[in-house]
Amino acid sequence: MTVAAHHLYLLAPGASPDDVRRFYRDALGLAEAQKPASLAHISVLWFSAGSIVFHVGHPAEGIVGDGHAALATDDLDAARARFIGMGYAVDDNVIPMGYPRFYVRDPWGNQFEILPEGLP
């Protein structure tokens, strides 16, 4: 089983899209990336820095959930089995996005999204 960085999901509670662009595009100099049409309904802007994509959530009503790092794997079932076998809780109860995925936290509370490789 292999894993690779996929994206980082960052939080911008209460920020407008213009506020988010002002920092990530204008100040940091990241390129705004187009998210897939299937995600158009989600209040998230995408920015790229080389091969890393930042997903920045900005709903005006606040954020539901936590920020996370996402890792893509060539064997989602093996990854899930490894975490469970090592005693880590796997959360499959996530908002449906049209592809299988799960979340897991490290012992210090940092959250990781584990998803199949090949997704935008």
Where does each model-flagged region fall?
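Helix N-cap motif at beta-to-alpha junctions
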Residues: 14, 74-77
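Core segments of cupin and vicinal oxygen chelate
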Residues: 9-52
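Vicinal oxygen chelate
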Residues: 1-3, 86-120
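Short hydrophobic/aromatic beta-strand element in the GNAT-like acyltransferase core
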Residues: 44, 53, 70, 101-102, ...
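A short linear hydrophobic-aromatic micro-motif
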Residues: 32-34, 55-56, 89-92
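Hydrophobic side chains in well-ordered alpha-helices
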Residues: 20, 79-82
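N-terminal beta-strand motif that seeds the catalytic metal site of vicinal oxygen chelate
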Residues: 1-21, 67-69, 120
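Short acidic/glycine-enriched loop/turn segments that link adjacent beta-strands
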Residues: 38-43, 63-65, 96-100
